[in-house]
A protein has these predicted regions:
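Structured catalytic core of nucleotide-sugar glycosyltransferases
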Residues: 1-124, 128, 151-161, 173-176, ...
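Conserved catalytic loops of nucleotide-sugar-dependent glycosyltransferases that act on lipid-linked
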Residues: 65, 69-77, 90, 94, ...
Length: 295
């Protein structure tokens, strides 16, 4: 931990009851760390409590979103390593040391919650489904897709600023973007404390749909055929099944079979073209990196 500077970023909205104690504990455990609190349009004295505890406080003029607060923190942080954690006191600052010991070898380390650490049974089941879907997309076993407690190298986080949404779904975007871009990721088990005050702002259905859309978006952005190919295959099988059935029962090739076959081919070609565009973007990015010279 002595070889690099660490910035701890705490997005907070109406967390006056917990933010001060959290900042004090971080500073007590890690005196040399930069602690940044992004006050996301709080209507209580969150900013004052954080400032009195010794944090560097930056405020949004109104509530923009948890992801927007993270992006603001990334922009102003000066550390080589950025640690993101919630401002409600559920994350234990002592776990940060366990993250950082892996940082020389990994680009991002994420705290993985146990099933018991999930806020509710419904959310635990939903997260399990999203973990499975994201693992398929990323070709990597994702233990906790939505965990907001993580450490990431600053250069990696900044490279995805344009993709991170303003909402609570930023962990999903960051995790999938890191994996699909070829950066390394490590999961570390953590325990989550119960909220002492307030309640979670995450809505299971609304945010669940958003998580699904983000997984699809990231997949089509970084590995389009992982989405297009299965859809094309299913339509082809349906078309083939319909063709065999109508051929045996009616002795002809129906319009439905033709439609399914044609749609299957179109979707496959769309995936192929998207994959080529994706590859060209990778090549352009690597070309830009190769032009950077050390002073």
């Amino acid at each position: 931990m002595q070889n690099f500077k660490v910035s701890v970023i705490l997005p907070a909205r109406n967390e006056a009851a917990t933010i001060g104690d959290l900042v004090l504990k971080i500073k007590d455990l890690y005196p040399g760390f930069e602690v940044i609190v992004i006050n996301d349009g709080s209507t209580d004295n969150t900013a004052e409590a954080a400032k009195n505890a010794g944090a560097d406080v930056y405020s949004h003029p109104y509530n923009i979103g948890n992801g927007a607060a993270i992006k603001s923190g990334i922009r102003v942080a000066s550390g080589d390593i950025l640690v993101f954690m919630d401002g409600d006191g559920q994350h234990d600052p002592s776990d940060i040391a366990g993250f950082l010991k892996y940082m020389p070898d990994y680009d991002m380390v994420v705290g993985a919650r146990s099933i018991k650490g999930q806020a509710s049974v419904g959310r635990a089941v939903g997260n399990k489904v999203y973990n499975w879907l994201a693992s398929y997309v990323a070709k990597f076993y994702i233990q906790d897709l939505t965990s907001g407690f993580r450490a990431v190298k600053s250069k990696v986080a900044k490279s995805f600023l344009h993709l991170i949404p303003n909402t609570y779904s930023y962990p999903t975007t960051l995790t999938l973007s890191v994996l699909r871009s070829g950066w390394s990721l490590k999961y570390v088990p953590i325990k989550i404390r119960a909220r002492s005050t307030g309640k979670s702002n995450i809505k299971i259905f609304k945010d669940g749909v958003r998580f699904f859309m983000i997984i699809t978006k990231i997949c089509t952005l970084y590995s389009p055929l992982r989405i297009f190919l299965p859809v094309s295959f299913v339509l082809f099988v349906l078309g083939l099944s319909n063709y065999i059935y109508t051929l045996l029962t009616q002795g002809r090739f129906t319009n439905m079979s033709a439609l399914l076959f044609t749609t299957s081919i179109i979707i496959f070609m769309m995936g192929l073209i998207s994959e080529q565009i994706c590859q060209m973007r990778y090549e352009r990015r690597e070309m830009d990196r190769s032009q950077i010279t050390k002073e």
